[in-house]
């Protein structure tokens, strides 16, 4: 589970340089796995300010997970057939959304690896 603070610009899906460095380390440690990887994007419940790119938190969470998956494919050598993405928007919170701290916990990327 990777917190999104510093991972993406607010309301965006481009990977920030610091997050790319972290993903590089994660990718290196996971590269020996022969299993499948699922990258899940999650958001808080604050509606996306429509900027022409993302219509909703569904769009945003899906694109963020796709950005992370694409990084693993391009930079860490994962095969496309072994990587899937999912965007869950605010449907799977791990904290309450009634505080800034809770919302920050809910904005995250989760990487699930099936080591089979």
Task: Annotate each language-model stretch with its function.
Residues 1, 7-22, 29-32, 42-116:
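Periplasmic OmpA-like peptidoglycan-binding domain that tethers envelope proteins to the cell wall
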